[in-house]
């Protein structure tokens, strides 16, 4: 990433979304939800986290992890189906999403309340992912996660596998759990766009009508997003990026094609 460090723009000059309330919704099939005791034990043993000030039970609970106040609440009803109708067709990471999600019977709300927290959005989403993974790993009836802010539907085993990237501080981030990457294929050209970078105080990114396969664009964009979030970089209109000294990809800010508002375009 040395080349990226030289060619990408400046360190973040805009205030990041610190201390905001973020949440996710694990989904369950059957009569049982998570066990608070098992979740706490997994957070300690698997992730090595210090969990303090635990109050509540399997229905509602709060506790602290470092500076973060965490709240868990089990809701004895499924998430309304209307919430998912517009995103099933785009949920390519969950093969049978519609069928399996329609069978869920209850869900939980996992919240980081952000009260007094000064940790970065990446640190907070990392913690949220660890919480979700601990719930999924310790609960046989859990089927997956709904990350509403990014319109992501994520199946259980995939979620657990991607979260394991957080065990190694030098590894890449589990971007797929935080940011939706839309892939548009048409004739011989493809486009990709992000939805969820705003959660980290960053601009959404689009690559429009590139002479590449959608899968190739996806593979190109992932390390860019990882670098932007890991290094807290703000891409600027008029700059260039590249993975080699010779590669200079122009960055342009303009009205988004697949999103509301503006986006940054990488011109391949």
PLM-predicted stretches and their roles:
Residues 32-37, 116-120, 153-154, 250, ...:
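Short, surface-exposed beta-strand/loop "edge" segments at domain boundaries and coil↔beta transitions
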Residues 77-172:
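Internal, hydrophobic cores of structured domains that mediate oligomerization or house catalytic pockets
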Residues 45-52, 130-145, 227-235:
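Structural alpha-beta junctions
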Residues 150-240, 245-268:
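Aromatic/basic-lined ligand-recognition segments
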Residues 35, 120-131, 213-220:
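Short amphipathic alpha-helical segments
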Residues 27, 31, 116-124, 209-213:
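Conserved aromatic-histidine-acidic binding/catalytic patches
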Residues 2-55, 257, 261-268:
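Short, extreme N-terminal segment that most often corresponds to the first beta-strand
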Residues 29-100:
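N-terminal low-complexity, intrinsically disordered segments
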């Amino acid at each position: 990433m040395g080349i990226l460090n030289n060619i990408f723009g400046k360190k973040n000059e805009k205030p990041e979304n610190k201390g905001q309330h973020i949440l996710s919704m694990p989904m369950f099939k059957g009569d049982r939800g998570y066990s608070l005791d098992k979740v706490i034990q997994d957070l300690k043993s698997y992730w090595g986290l210090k969990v303090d000030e635990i109050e509540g039970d399997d229905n509602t609970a709060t506790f602290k992890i470092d500076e973060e106040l965490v709240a868990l609440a089990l809701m004895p009803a499924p998430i309304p189906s209307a919430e998912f109708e517009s995103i099933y067709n785009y949920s390519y990471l969950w093969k049978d999403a519609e069928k399996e999600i329609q069978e869920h019977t209850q869900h939980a709300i996992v919240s980081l309340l952000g009260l007094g927290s000064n940790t970065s959005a990446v640190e907070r989403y990392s913690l949220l992912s660890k919480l979700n993974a601990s719930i999924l790993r310790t609960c046989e009836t859990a089927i997956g996660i709904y990350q509403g802010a990014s319109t992501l539907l994520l199946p259980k085993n995939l979620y657990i596998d991607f979260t394991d990237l957080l065990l190694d501080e030098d590894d890449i981030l589990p971007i797929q759990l935080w940011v939706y990457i839309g892939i548009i294929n048409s004739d011989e050209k493809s486009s990709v766009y992000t939805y969820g970078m705003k959660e980290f105080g960053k601009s959404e990114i689009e690559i429009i009508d590139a002479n590449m396969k959608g899968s190739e664009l996806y593979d190109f964009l992932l390390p860019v997003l990882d670098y932007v979030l890991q290094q807290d970089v703000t891409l600027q209109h008029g700059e260039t990026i590249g993975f080699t000294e010779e590669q200079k990809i122009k960055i342009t800010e303009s009205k988004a094609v697949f999103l509301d508002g503006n986006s940054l375009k990488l011109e391949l």
